[in-house]
């Protein structure tokens, strides 16, 4: 053991030891309790950033802690390798995305290994490998057979110059990020997965996720968006056709003054054929972004269709407008407009001089100026004929029943959740295993022809879809009739890859089936770690896919993740680290200067996992100083501990002196609190406990046999508490101080109940209720001894001078009050 702390050397030695001994490679073992710890897999950008380091350090602390607790721990790592960023980077660098991606993976794998994470690298997966996406294609075929994968027209952001679909984040001020062209809304045929078939179960099972953050549960509940409402039929003024409207406020039905339909509604398209003004309006609407948030905040615009519907109760004529704020994807693409009781309808009505008809007044009877603002709360019905004077809640049921009994409507449970559109008009993604034949139509690729390989030598230009221009890919033969046919050139949304990867880690070498029985052993994941930004999309899709895999008999649980931790961001100067802000701190430079253990210790000590972490250079220096202090202390006690650790009776040592028992009690109290905090995932206070223990031990001397044994016990506790957080130095010191074996094979320390037993009490001494001193007495001291000790306390005696004691009151285990 060197006298000075040399992190680079000891970290290299520890990592070589783990690799040579395959320390973290695990096998299924039914005799042991399993623990599956997983951090969200990274996109291989080429460089680890501090957000990665924090995420993976937290996960590693949890995994190593569970190893110490004797569990069979799986902690794998892989790469979310497909997607738009790789394609864009490849366009800029003029090289194939496959080449760029694999180069980045190699670099990032090395960076992760430098941090000493306890990953089972034998299970590594890369989502752009055909051995992985082959099973994703197989899964798509199963969904297609069950009617859960289907194709329909949907609206997308279309760049007319680059001839490609854009994600919302690729649009800057209404223009394509590369071409600068004005982006259009275009309707194209796309593949969808029927997640809505699982809406009710996805909502209901949120109640089972007891160890998920409440914020995530709420976000998913709102995204699924269950509502109870009524479908209402509005017949056309002329002809047998009707428009169906879904509403959660049937109590406002008598206040409807117009209907509004989406620009993509078939009726709007039909009217555009007969009116140039309507056609021009629909064209203008195509230049609106697709995102719901953008539509909600844009200026409300519309045009009269020239058609009328009939109110189902009053039989009044209602004009039908085409409005840019109505979403075709929501319900039926038709809105019943109640301007007096809906802010959006109110804004639109004032703009186009449409009538307002108040039908709800505040329940407390105070006046409301409906011309100034819509009254949107429940209340009492007015101007509603036979429904007058009943409250909104009662009116919901009364009007719903009336509509049902008169064939004008029906109750319906509605979900805001829409089917998952997985088509991407991109190159770098999983090919969708579908063939189009002029004779046979849409034909799924036979399972024995999987995988449909993505050509990896393409250099995308950013114009159009590269697969549509690659004849060697799209030209094929129909598997049914053997005539010339074409492949689907859309690729899958990368969220599909990340919706089932956690299960594939259980059997990445399996080439006969998607998942085998090992998946049932390891799933569900016991602890999942990742950012709150994935609360809805990724986590919802993974929950959906887990239920699909269960229904296919591949898994035997209902949910993928038992416990979820959403870690906070890493900030510098109050802002999230980013290259554009110039506030990035690179992990590699810190590891080179201080070592991985220092980086890990700072990350863990600086803030609780779920809170944002403010970067501090002085905090990193402080972590480094602590590890040097630990090393220096260990070097000083090395010879004494090596000698004690060779003694057979070392574990049965008895401490007699009160001061030694008190010191031991302090150490075990720190351990007791640290164990509570480890279970609560409050790792920063575990570090605080370790620092307290070291400060206690440093004051002891190895020249005293009792204290030397205290140092041995305390150091053994300290190193195990640090082992999940700073594994390299803990591994090295454990062996250098003669504790024997691998520290990871030793059980997690537990406080000794005897050590926690208090032998002395501190009591406060009052004179006429005022604090005058404190005394230490044995726990079982008699009243006489307590009184005598209190009266002989120096400060108490000074205040008693020339005073006559009337009585002494002893409150057991709390205080003594001397009345004078």
Swiss-Prot record:
Keywords: Aminoacyl-tRNA synthetase, ATP-binding, Cytoplasm, Ligase, Nucleotide-binding, Protein biosynthesis. This is Leucine--tRNA ligase. It comes from the Bacteria. The lineage of its organism: Bacteria, Pseudomonadati, Pseudomonadota, Gammaproteobacteria, Legionellales. It is found in: Cytoplasm. CDD domains: Anticodon_Ia_Leu_BEm, LeuRS_core. It holds the Pfam family tRNA-synt_1. It is an enzyme of class 6 (ligase). GO terms for molecular function: aminoacyl-tRNA deacylase activity; ATP binding; leucine-tRNA ligase activity. Disulfide bonds: none annotated. The keyword Transcription does not apply. Its EC number is 6.1.1.4. GO terms for biological process: leucyl-tRNA aminoacylation. ATP binds at residue 579. A motif ('KMSKS' region) lies at residues 576-580. Its main location: cytoplasm. It comes from Coxiella burnetii (strain RSA 331 / Henzerling II). A motif ('HIGH' region) lies at residues 42-52. It catalyses: tRNA(Leu) + L-leucine + ATP = L-leucyl-tRNA(Leu) + AMP + diphosphate. GO terms for cellular component: cytosol. Belongs to the class-I aminoacyl-tRNA synthetase family.
């Amino acid at each position: 053991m060197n006298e000075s702390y040399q992190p680079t050397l000891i970290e290299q030695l520890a990592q070589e030891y783990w690799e040579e001994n395959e320390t973290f490679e695990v096998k299924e073992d039914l005799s042991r309790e399993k623990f599956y710890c997983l951090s969200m897999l990274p996109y291989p950008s080429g460089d680890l950033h501090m957000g990665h380091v924090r995420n993976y350090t937290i996960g590693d602390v949890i995994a190593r802690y569970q190893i110490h607790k004797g569990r069979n721990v799986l902690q794998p790592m892989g790469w979310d390798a497909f997607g738009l960023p790789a394609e864009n980077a490849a366009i800029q660098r003029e090289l194939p995305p496959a080449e760029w991606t694999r180069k980045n993976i190699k670099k990032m794998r090395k960076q992760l290994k430098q941090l000493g994470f306890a990953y089972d690298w034998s299970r590594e997966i890369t989502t752009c490998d055909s051995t992985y996406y082959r099973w994703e294609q197989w899964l798509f075929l199963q969904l297609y057979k069950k009617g859960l994968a289907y194709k329909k027209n949907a609206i997308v952001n279309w760049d007319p110059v680059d001839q490609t679909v854009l994600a919302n984040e690729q649009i800057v001020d209404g223009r394509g990020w590369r071409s600068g062209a004005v982006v259009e809304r275009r309707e194209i045929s796309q593949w969808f997965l029927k997640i809505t078939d699982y809406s009710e179960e996805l909502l209901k099972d949120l109640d089972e996720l007891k160890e998920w953050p409440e914020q995530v549960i709420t976000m998913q509940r709102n995204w699924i968006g269950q509502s109870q409402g009524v479908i209402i039929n509005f017949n056309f003024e002329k002809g047998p056709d009707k428009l169906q409207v879904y509403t959660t406020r049937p109590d406002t039905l008598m206040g409807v003054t117009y209907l509004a339909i989406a620009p993509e509604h078939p009726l709007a398209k039909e009217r555009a054929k007969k009116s140039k003004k309507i056609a021009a309006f629909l064209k203008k609407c195509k230049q609106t972004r697709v995102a719901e948030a953008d539509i909600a905040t844009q200026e409300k615009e519309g045009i009269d269709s020239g058609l009328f519907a009939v109110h189902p109760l009053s039989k009044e004529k209602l004009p039908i407008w085409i409005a840019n704020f109505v979403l075709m994807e929501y319900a039926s693409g038709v809105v019943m407009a109640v301007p007096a009781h809906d802010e959006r309808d109110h804004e639109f009505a004032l703009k186009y001089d449409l009538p307002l008809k108040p039908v709800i007044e505040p329940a407390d009877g105070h006046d409301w100026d409906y011309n100034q603002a819509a009254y949107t709360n429940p209340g009492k019905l007015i101007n509603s004929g036979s429904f007058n004077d009943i409250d909104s809640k009662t009116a919901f049921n009364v009007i719903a029943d009336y509509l049902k009994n008169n064939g004008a409507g029906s109750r319906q449970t509605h979900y805001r959740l829409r089917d998952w559109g997985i088509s991407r008009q991109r190159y770098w993604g999983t090919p969708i295993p579908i063939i189009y034949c002029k004779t046979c139509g849409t034909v799924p690729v036979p399972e024995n022809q999987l995988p449909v390989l993505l050509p990896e030598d393409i250099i995308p230009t950013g114009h159009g879809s590269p697969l549509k221009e690659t004849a060697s890919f799209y030209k094929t033969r129909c598997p049914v009739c053997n005539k010339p046919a074409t492949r689907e050139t859309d690729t899958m949304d990368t969220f599909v890859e990340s919706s089932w990867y956690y299960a594939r880690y259980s059997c990445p070498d399996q080439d006969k089936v998607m998942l085998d029985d090992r998946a049932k052993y390891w799933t569900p994941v016991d602890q999942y770690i990742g950012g709150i930004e994935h609360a809805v999309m990724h986590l919802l899709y993974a929950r959906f896919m887990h239920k699909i895999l269960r229904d296919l008999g591949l898994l035997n649980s209902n949910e993928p993740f038992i416990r979820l931790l959403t870690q906070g961001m890493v900030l510098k100067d109050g802002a999230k680290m980013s290259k554009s802000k110039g506030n990035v701190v690179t992990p590699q430079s810190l590891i080179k200067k201080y070592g991985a253990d220092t980086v890990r210790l700072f990350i863990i000590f600086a803030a609780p996992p779920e809170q944002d972490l403010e970067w501090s250079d002085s905090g990193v220096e402080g972590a480094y100083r602590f590890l040097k202090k630990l090393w220096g202390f260990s070097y000083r006690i090395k010879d004494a501990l090596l000698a004690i650790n060779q003694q057979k009776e070392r574990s049965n040592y008895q401490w007699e002196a009160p001061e030694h028992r008190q010191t031991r009690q302090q150490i075990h109290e720190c351990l007791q609190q640290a164990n509570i905090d480890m279970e609560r995932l409050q790792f920063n206070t575990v570090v605080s406990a370790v620092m307290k223990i070291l400060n206690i031990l440093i004051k002891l001397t190895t020249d005293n046999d009792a204290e030397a044994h205290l140092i041995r016990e305390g150091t053994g506790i300290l190193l195990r508490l640090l082992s999940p957080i700073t594994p390299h130095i803990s591994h090295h010191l454990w062996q250098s101080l003669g504790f024997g074996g691998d520290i990871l094979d030793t059980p997690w320390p537990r406080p000794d109940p005897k050590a926690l037993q208090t032998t002395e009490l501190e009591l406060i001494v009052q004179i006429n209720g005022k604090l005058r001193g404190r005394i230490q007495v044995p726990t079982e001291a008699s009243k006489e001894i307590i009184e005598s000790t209190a009266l002989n306390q120096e400060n108490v005696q000074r205040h008693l001078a020339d005073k006559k004691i009337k009585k002494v009151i002893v409150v057991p285990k709390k205080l003594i009050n001397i009345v004078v």
